[in-house]
Amino acid sequence: MLTLARQQQRQNIRWLLCLSVLMLLALLLSLCAGEQWISPGDWFSPRGELFVWQIRLPRTLAVLLVGAALAISGAVMQALFENPLAEPGLLGVSNGAGVGLIAAVLLGQGQLPNWALGLCAIAGALIITLILLRFARRHLSTSRLLLAGVALGIICSALMTWAIYFSTSVDLRQLMYWMMGGFGGVDWRQSWLMLALIPVLLWICCQSRPMNMLALGEISARQLGLPLWFWRNVLVAATGWMVGVSVALAGAIGFIGLVIPHILRLCGLTDHRVLLPGCALAGASALLLADIVARLALAAAELPIGVVTATLGAPVFIWLLLKARR
């Protein structure tokens, strides 16, 4: 028994090391790749100081943090709702952030600065999260709370569609591109959004014990003495914050939170002591690679990264759906 535990521990360490190396390679490639390839030896040249340190580095850090946040949010939601198909957009938080952004553009008549739009997007996400917490305080089952999130997402999506469809504002039409996800406008001015993700990411990665209990199911978690109501509220709020900040930073990006945790579980990373940091590393790597594809796929334009993740993630989602039906 002890030998099996040690073998599993060594395997988990190998996985984390491999994912760390993959993330570092993706980070290095992201800094080098672009319209002009800049090798590490040229990073401190005048050209490198402009393209690498002022343009590519803030974008790369944003992609890394958003990918980690979305993947960890997916792992938390899948444990919280006991559903392998749960993902960050499922609770309607992403669409809530979109509604907040559209409301800011309408009320500000396109004159608000980018940081104000970001705050409004976070506020929209947190409002949806507070509504979900109201449902959670009624001690609803996870399935009903999940359905409440789906309903809120549909309502927010309808509000965004109505606002954009009847708008003559160029800014609102450009929001459709923003909602498809993209890091094209990210620079050091958005560093406060990046910093807002780091404390919550680190905190959730340290909560493996309650996450392991939640993964056993509500009844088992209660029997083990876990204050279920408290942890459900805290985790929903933390997920809402991470998704809201991610949407404010890069728009709506799907499938990272769905695919990454499930693939890692299939690889044997079921213990949240390993799964949570593994999701952070794998999510960051996957989104970095998707961002590189979005930048290089077209010569004269940049693909929305949400299109890339949807193209790669949709077949996996269908496979998971068919597997769940069995």
UniProtKB/Swiss-Prot annotation:
GO terms for cellular component: plasma membrane. GO terms for biological process: cobalamin transport. Keywords: Cell inner membrane, Cell membrane, Membrane, Transmembrane, Transmembrane helix, Transport. GO terms for molecular function: vitamin transmembrane transporter activity. It is found in: Cell inner membrane. The chain crosses the membrane at residues 15-35, 61-81, 88-108, 112-132, 146-166, 184-204, 240-260, 274-294, 302-322. Gene3D superfamilies: ABC transporter involved in vitamin B12 uptake, BtuC. It is a multi-pass membrane protein. Its main location: membrane. InterPro entries: ABC_BtuC-like, ABC_transptr_BtuC, ABC_transptr_permease_BtuC. NCBIfam families: PRK03784.1 (NF003001). The complex is composed of two ATP-binding proteins (BtuD), two transmembrane proteins (BtuC) and a solute-binding protein (BtuF). Part of the ABC transporter complex BtuCDF involved in vitamin B12 import. Involved in the translocation of the substrate across the membrane. Belongs to the binding-protein-dependent transport system permease family. FecCD subfamily. This is Vitamin B12 import system permease protein BtuC. It comes from Escherichia coli (strain 55989 / EAEC). The gene is btuC.
